[in-house]
Amino acid sequence: MGDEKVMDYKIDQIGIVVKDLDKTAAFLEKLGVGPFPTIETEVPGGKVKIGIFQQGDLQIELIQPLEGDTIHSRWLKEKGEGIHHVSYHCKDIEKELQKLEKLGVKILDRGEIFGVKWAYLDTEPHCGFILELGQWPEG
């Protein structure tokens, strides 16, 4: 690969798994972090409630598992509340995933929500959290 960097993009999101999104958001909003508009959405294996606060180029995403056996519900059960993922924005997720696959990095989960393609990478054993790649729709 030479000098070409893997994931040569900026961090655009920190994802935090929580038991009670409304309670967590209310506390953070008292500290000046927020507001967290919320939605409920399907993810592979179930359903979650998501609240996102945008500050400049960075999003803070609160994720509350609601139904099913999802990567988020398993994380909450096994590790408790806390940082789940750090997301890098990329322009071509398929190209980046191919680079990472050549390095032996496995994909834990992937999908598309509201036009955003995303993939969780199996990095938790190495750094304590999951790295995510996200490709936003153009425009």
Language-model segments: residues:
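Long, hydrophobic N-terminal alpha-helical segment
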Residues: 2-46, 55
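Short, charged/polar surface micro-motifs in flexible loops or helix N-caps
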Residues: 56-60, 67-69, 93
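Regulatory and interaction patches adjacent to catalytic/ligand-binding sites
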Residues: 75
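Vicinal oxygen chelate
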Residues: 2-5, 18-25, 30-32, 51-54, 60-61, 67, 78-139, ...
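Short amphipathic beta-strand starts and helix->beta connectors
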Residues: 2, 67-72
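Short loop/beta submotifs within extracellular cysteine-rich repeat domains
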Residues: 24, 35-36, 70-71, 128-129
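Short, structured motif recognition centered on aromatic/hydrophobic residues
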Residues: 11-18, 28, 53, 60-63, ...
